[in-house]
């Protein structure tokens, strides 16, 4: 894992473990391969600053459920059970939302590494509109 702006490294590992269960890798790449954690970290210091407190409180809630152990240290079935226990909390809901956003947002926002999410849904971004030069540039 690289550098984070909002998360500490242990916090990033917790969110990454959650994201991997929300959008797992199977026959197709998931949240880990799309590097969703970097999208979430960037979101929390830009457009989603108002969600920082939910994350801070949520780390405590998750730690209480895991007995202070990292979520990723548990077998997958236990991780799913632990996340199911908090799935109705604001913390889980926002991590889920941010995970999905990180899978399918434009890569320049930190997630969707190598356009993995777009490839899964067949989105071709080469057709994005760009205004032509010329009369549109004149005042």
Label each PLM-derived region with a short phrase.
Residues 29, 33-34:
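Zn2+-dependent metallopeptidase catalytic domains
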